[in-house]
């Protein structure tokens, strides 16, 4: 196979998929704060995941590792409860709703629905 053909194939693959999918945690961080570890939300939310102060379990909210650990500590029980009550894992859309409005997971508001769709687009790219 010639170098030119290999280059053409690789270029085609790259152009056909210019963006790569993010995992859920990366997409959540991107949607919530643009990956800004120093972000503070209008309600005092902290970290790249915009966690409410009363839910923050400890650690440095400006440290990406601590923030991810805190987000997982908050979210994993929500995911477990969803799976128990719905008899299936949460979809990407439901994951985002569980993060922002767990009490409305079956009927999210229009604003949360719009953000959940953007979240899904980041995960599925």
Show the residue positions of the predicted features.
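Bacterial N-terminal signal peptides
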Residues: 6-14
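Substrate-binding/active-site groove segments that recognize
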Residues: 41-59, 97-99
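Alpha-helical segment that forms one wall of the substrate-binding/catalytic cleft
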Residues: 57-108, 116-123
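Positively charged n-region of N-terminal signal peptides that target proteins for export
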Residues: 1-5
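A short, acidic/glycine-rich surface segment
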Residues: 36-39, 82
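Sec/Tat signal peptide C-region and signal peptidase I cleavage site
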Residues: 16-21
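Short, solvent-exposed loop/turn and secondary-structure capping segments
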Residues: 39-42, 109-110
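Short, functionally critical alpha-helical segments immediately adjacent to catalytic or ligand/cofactor-binding
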Residues: 22-36, 51, 71-72, 95-103
